[in-house]
Structure formats: structure tokens, C-alpha cells
Amino acid sequence: MVSSTSELITQPVNREEVVPSRKRIKLPAWLEVVKPRLIPLLLATTVGGMALSEEWPLPSPRLACTLGGGALAAAAAGALNCLWEQDLDKRMKRTSNRALPSGRLSQSSVFIGAVACTLVSSALLVSGVNCLAAGLTLLGLCSYVLLYTAFLKPRTSQNIVFGGVAGAIPPLVGASAAAGHIGLGGWWLFSLVMVWTPAHFWALAILLKEDYRSVGIPMLPTVSGPFVTAKAISVYGYLTVFLSFLGCFVLPEGGLLYGILLLPYNSRLLQLVSRLRDNPEDLDRAKGLFRWSILYMFGVCFLLVISRLQVSIVFNDQLIALIKDFSIGFS
């Protein structure tokens, strides 16, 4: 009985079981290769970077050019990633039916599409935003395709720790789009995404470790096992919580309100991290942490924007005044 239970807990799952929308929505081949499900979170952290600037909110045309250019660059990065990894995808049952391995799209059409997206993205950002935002966006694209996909991913179990820089660049793009420079707030959100990424991705890697093992990709769960991975996730989870609260001090306004609203997000994150550390072989716990980690980062960016609303700023100032009056009463 114990043996059968263990097999049930550790049985590998498909990505479709982790992200239920994959079951319901069959994407066209041309849309599948650009990995559209990854783009919304990248745009959310871009907006988060904007909200940390004194110049928030941005004029609508500049906001549209920033998000449009970012989405196109992310699409190009996704397509180039699919091109690079098509041989690996052929060898994994989970990915063998993707557009390139199955022959539904040709390599040349995907490459041309990626180049077109990159050129239009750069044109939008240079003409509608600024050269710094355009340069950072191009840096993010190159770091994802060259640094992470081509160099780090097949060589080291710490690939996502260093390769995570690609996913952390959008806050820098947002900050530079708003102010023309990055600033302390942009660097803070960049750092937060960097430390959040390993905990987020390794939870997924636990679920898909057999896929990675079958093609020789040295993800941490395949190299060191789920127990070591769960401990590493715990370290990065606590770092994420610590860094997230520093946002109280880098927000131009509304920092106290942001910190208060962040409490339940961090409490839930630590709860799920602890549950996985207690039983790293329970795939339901890894799945729960992976899903929550996505909502967590969306939530942080949402709170950054909410904290910059005028009504939030007024409420934040009233809270500070109340705390001061309360402290004076005890002095």
C-alpha cells in the first residue's frame, strides 16, 4: 500500500495538468511558437517597473509602444527558442507535437517571423519610447536565446539562476520607458524577479524532471533530486519575501499600503514553500507552488500600480499620520 501511494505521488505529470488552460485552448501553429502564455507576466513586470517611477502614469502612446514592443520582442524570443530546441522537442513525448517538430511550420517561416517581430519591436520602442528601452529589450531577447537557451540550459543545473536575467529585464524596460533611466525602483524589481525565478521554475522542473532527464537537460531536480531542490526553493522563497518588502522604501508614494497588502501574498508563498520542503516528492505541492508563484508576481505588480493611485496615496498618508499619533500617545 505504501509503495502504490509513493508511485502515485511521484508519477510525472504533463504540462497540461499544471496549466489547465492548455487543455481547453489549442493554439494555431504560428501562435504556439511565440509562447503567448509567457507574455502577460513579462508585460506585468514592465508595468511594475513603470509604477516605481516618479513619472507614473505614462502617456498612453508611450505606454502602448512600450507594451507592444515588449510583446513583440517576447514573441521573437519564444520563436527563436523553439527553433533552437526543436531537436530536443522531437525527443520528448510532451513536446513532439509542437509546431516545428511535427512539421506544421517550417524553420524558415519561424525565423523570418522572429526577425520581423524583432525589427518591428525595435522600431516601436525607438520611435515611441527611447533608445534605452529599445536596447534593454533587445538585451533581454538575446540573453534568453543565447545566454539561457543556447549556453546555460544544457550545461549547468544553475541555468535558471543566471539565465533568469532575461525574465528580469522587463522591469528595467518599464523604468527606462517612464523616466529615461532605470533608477533604484527598477533595479529593485529586477532583483526581486531574479530571486523569484528559481523558486518558480524549479517547482515546475520537479513536475517535469523525467522529461528533462530523458533528453539530458541538467535541471536541478534531475541532477540533485527533489529534496535538494526543495531546500533551494525554500532559500529563494525567503529571499523573495525579504526583497518584496523592500518595495515599501523604493515606491515614490504608497509604500506603507503596499507593504500591508503584500502580507497575505507572502504568507501564502511561505506556506507553500514550507509544505513542499516537508514533502518534496508530493507533486501536488510542487504544482500548487508553481501556480501560486505566477499569481504572486502578478499580485506584486498589481499592488505597485494600486499603491500609486491617488486614493491609495491619501489613504497611505492617513495611515502614517495615525501611526505617528499612536506612537506619540505612548511616548
From Swiss-Prot:
Pathway linked to the protein: Porphyrin-containing compound metabolism; heme O biosynthesis; heme O from protoheme: step 1/1
Pfam families from the UniProt entry: UbiA
Enzymatic reactions: heme b + (2E,6E)-farnesyl diphosphate + H2O = Fe(II)-heme o + diphosphate
Primary location recorded for the protein, binned into one broad class: membrane
GO molecular function, one term: protoheme IX farnesyltransferase activity
GO CC entries: plasma membrane
Residues annotated as transmembrane: 63-83, 109-129, 132-152, 160-180, 188-208, 215-235, 241-261, 294-314
Subcellular location: Cell inner membrane
Domain of life: Bacteria
Enzyme Commission (EC) number: 2.5.1.141
Record's keyword terms, sorted: Cell inner membrane, Cell membrane, Heme biosynthesis, Membrane, Transferase, Transmembrane, Transmembrane helix
BP GO terms, sorted: heme O biosynthetic process
Enzyme class: transferase
Additional remarks: Carbon 2 of the heme B porphyrin ring is defined according to the Fischer nomenclature.
Function: Converts heme B (protoheme IX) to heme O by substitution of the vinyl group on carbon 2 of heme B porphyrin ring with a hydroxyethyl farnesyl side group.
Name of the molecule in the record: Protoheme IX farnesyltransferase
Species of origin: Prochlorococcus marinus (strain NATL1A)
